[in-house]
Amino acid sequence: MAASHSPFTRFVHGESFAGLLLVGTALIAFIWANSPWRETYFAAQHTHLALSLGDARLDLSLEHWVNDGLMAVFFLLVGLEIKRELLIGELSSRRRVALAVTAALGGMLVPAALYTALNVGGPGLSGWGVPMSTDIAFALGVLALLGSRVPLGLKVFLTALAIVDDLGAVLVIALFYTSGLNLTFLTLAALTWGAALYAGWRGAFSLKLYGVLGVLLWFFVLKSGLHATIAGVLLAFAVPIRRPDPADYLASLAEAAKPGRGEVVGARLRDLEDLLERAQSPLHRLEHALHPFVTFLVLPVFALTNAGVPVAAGGFGSVSLGVLLGLLLGKPLGVVGGAWLAVRMGMASLPRRVNWGHMVGSGLLAGIGFTMSLFVSNLAFDDSVLLTQAKLGVLLASVLAALLGAGWLLLGIRGQAPSGRDDVQVDLPR
């Protein structure tokens, strides 16, 4: 099978387009926020929308609906991808997961340490989590633009790295950017999640069931004081990945295919449709359904809502510098250092056709923080000046990381032979 038809290559192309779409919407937002019409941008951000159901009422600004509501769907997709990769994907192999985890840990700890060193004792210290994340869509978008110059094993590694990175970001948000918990709603959220876990354990295949439980979980988490997006990750880990028993499936398929009268045939056709839908696991069906929604709506709307940074409002302070150095310097140092440690200790080896020059390039691209870094910025800062500084640092670092990473990989390390073994098995063109 050609590489263009392999599932992973299709995934990379999808993420690549998402990255290009993010660039476009972010650029529109940035220009709009610094244009003579900038007041309309910020007025739209703070326009309130309310939903009422009986006595319950939820009144949030458009910015909060995007960051707390739509982004919960993004985190649901992230959670589904993490679960899939852990159980049957690139993170299911001990050696592969060791390389991704050590590289991701280095890529989170070193940027956070650099940022902290530059902001210790100052009002911007709470932003230490901002430079810890990698935007998988942006990073893979840059790799896709480089075409065949980049070995597929590097794309697989960067994807696994970003997924572990996302998991780390979720934990950081849950543990360090949460305050003022409401125990009543926290209990209701726990009970709802327990119901979802029980449904998954019992093998419930209805996506509508998980949808209803997900909406309730999101509302309770929002009201509990935890960030609402955590609900997306919690729900993802409840959605089952196993498929129906093949023997039962084939028996039901044979029964539904038997000839009969018109009304019987109609009923059996509906049974066949249901069986075909259930042939895939709920996790795969939900992931497949959410991907275009997140790619074409959630992330572009998030970029449009959050990338409008007025340059003159906050200036370039220690927060901006900490984010910039954390992503541009801390990320490659941490990623390459973590990967080197895993290889040195015999825990892992580099993917096929990937050398240390490639790993430096991937470390530079990991400095494209964009989506997650902007998201954490909103949680870290209440002060508008510090928030503007953080966002300015994220945008500048993401652009520079993309240019430096692409430039490094284009130049190549031609004199250095690939040192990785065939750890990544993929379909290549014949």
From Swiss-Prot:
It is found in: Cell membrane. It is a multi-pass membrane protein. The chain crosses the membrane at residues 11-31, 60-80, 97-117, 127-147, 181-201, 215-235, 288-308, 309-329, 356-376, 393-413. One of its GO terms (biological process) is regulation of pH. GO terms for molecular function: sodium:proton antiporter activity. GO terms for cellular component: plasma membrane. It catalyses: Na(+)(in) + 2 H(+)(out) = Na(+)(out) + 2 H(+)(in). It comes from the Bacteria. Disulfide bonds: none annotated. Its main location: membrane. Na(+)/H(+) antiporter that extrudes sodium in exchange for external protons. PANTHER family: NA(+)_H(+) ANTIPORTER NHAA, SODIUM ION/PROTON ANTIPORTER NHAA-RELATED. This is Na(+)/H(+) antiporter NhaA 2. It comes from Deinococcus geothermalis (strain DSM 11300 / CIP 105573 / AG-3a). The lineage of its organism: Bacteria, Thermotogati, Deinococcota, Deinococci, Deinococcales.
